[in-house]
């Protein structure tokens, strides 16, 4: 992207079938699962500032100048205030799985390198993902701090060996952006998949129609100025892209 003078960035999720095995590579927060007749097989892991906290903090430990004196690499359960200086609070650093205690110093009052939890977790207060492609020019707003050094483009690859499984006609690979997974869990998606395919067995376009069905489920229905799943739950506000790939007769393509 830098070579073609393009700006911006994206996550990446790719699948390859080769010599009887399925390889799924993921860098970002998209997700892939296999929906089989009697089971669900996760084929990816999401990479967020929260899930990669230790890697990100370790980079800040090795190269403190990347923070430009504006951020602290330490994680705290809450934002610290001036009254906390001199008191012991819980914290985590790159070498810690759990929490420990430290005496708060003035430098600890800076904004955390990784802040928030779940979908609200942010890297440098900017990005919700920690792996992906691009974002070479991205900087923290109103600063010269570059985000790119903390991002990794290296994917995690999961492998599924078809020789170890009896693949059925309705077994599929679901690949989707976080717009789907923000509002539907693996079990809910699998329920939609199995029900839809069972009810549309003779439709030659059923896999494409299933992808549309999943998008519509996550988008919900418009109620006033909002899109809602039901009366009390908001629908996905993110982009929703879904691929449904049948696993049966895979040697034909």
Map each language-model feature to its residues.
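PP2C/PPM-type serine/threonine phosphatase catalytic core
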Residues: 1-253
């Amino acid at each position: 992207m830098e070579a073609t003078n393009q700006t911006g960035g994206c996550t990446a999720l790719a699948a390859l079938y080769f010599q009887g095995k399925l390889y799924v590579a993921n860098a970002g927060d998209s997700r892939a699962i296999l929906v089989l007749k009697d089971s669900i097989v996760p084929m990816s892991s999401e990479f967020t500032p929260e899930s990669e906290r230790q890697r990100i903090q370790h980079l800040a430990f090795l190269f403190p100048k990347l923070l430009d004196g504006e951020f602290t690499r330490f994680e705290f359960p809450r934002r610290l205030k001036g009254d906390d200086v001199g008191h012991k609070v819980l914290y985590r650093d790159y070498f810690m799985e759990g929490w420990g205690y430290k005496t708060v110093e003035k430098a600890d009052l800076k904004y955390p390198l990784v802040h928030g939890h779940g979908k609200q977790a942010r890297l440098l207060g900017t990005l919700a993902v920690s792996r992906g492609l691009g974002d070479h020019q991205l900087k923290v707003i109103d600063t010269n701090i570059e985000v790119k050094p903390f991002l990794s483009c290296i994917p995690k690859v999961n492998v599924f060996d078809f020789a170890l499984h009896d693949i059925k006609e309705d077994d599929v690979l679901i690949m989707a952006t976080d717009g789907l997974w923000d509002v539907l869990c693996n079990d809910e998606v699998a329920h939609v998949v199995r029900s839809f395919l069972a009810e549309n067995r003779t439709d030659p376009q059923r896999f494409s129609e299933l992808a549309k069905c999943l998008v519509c489920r996550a988008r919900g229905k418009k109620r006033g100025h909002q899109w809602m799943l039901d009366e009390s739950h908001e629908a996905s506000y993110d982009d929703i892209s879904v691929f449904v790939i049948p696993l049966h007769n895979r040697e034909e393509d």
